Amino acid sequence: MFKFTQHNGIVMPLDIANIDTDIIIPKQFLQKVNKLGFGKYLFHNWRFIDENQSQINPNFILNIEKYKKSSILLTRDNFGCGSSREHAVWALLDYGFKVIIAPSFSDIFYNNSFNNKLLLITLPNNQIDKFFNIINQNPGIYFNIDLLKNEIKVEKKIYSFQIDKFRRFCLLNGLDDIDLTLKNIEKIDSYEKKICNFLIKRKKFVS
């Protein structure tokens, strides 16, 4: 069970708005239904020059040595827009990203991310601009994300962020939708026992 409390990692700056899920992972790589192995397809059309991934695009930031082990992504507005594919979140996590910082996210991507324990931090544009400037001056810099304190530590400076209390609780305790459901299994069992006779009678009535 993964519990998110703190994370210290290299920040990759991706100064592009409206990055959709087809850019995050193209549709031809969505054949599997488990969550593993999608990291190699992350940003495929930007990372590689050819479809077979034999030619790396040297100009894409994730291929630059300092950013290959990035685990925090800094980007722009409306990240994760487009289709609702959950594979986009799986690809980010499988590559190694733990946190994404942006001014805004697509609603469906936002929900998918927290359901898979990927922390999304929303900050105003002026703060995002400041972070981009810091990273451009210090390539490969580490940010420390403290979910217990809702703080981002950059060198000796501390920046606060807000997050939905329920989402925060789930991340801190390593809970997903299934875990939350199982916490109420006794109530669910009790409810099902109460409705059982009604369902049987209804079934007989219909037949």
Swiss-Prot record:
The keyword Lyase applies. Pfam families: Aconitase_C (PF00694). Gene3D superfamilies: Aconitase, domain 4. GO terms for molecular function: 3-isopropylmalate dehydratase activity. InterPro entries: 3-IsopropMal_deHydase_ssu, Aconitase/3IPM_dehydase_swvl, AconitaseA/IPMdHydase_ssu_swvl, IPMI_Swivel, LeuD. SUPFAM superfamilies: LeuD/IlvD-like. Belongs to the LeuD family. LeuD type 1 subfamily. This is 3-isopropylmalate dehydratase small subunit. The lineage of its organism: Bacteria, Pseudomonadati, Pseudomonadota, Gammaproteobacteria, Enterobacterales.
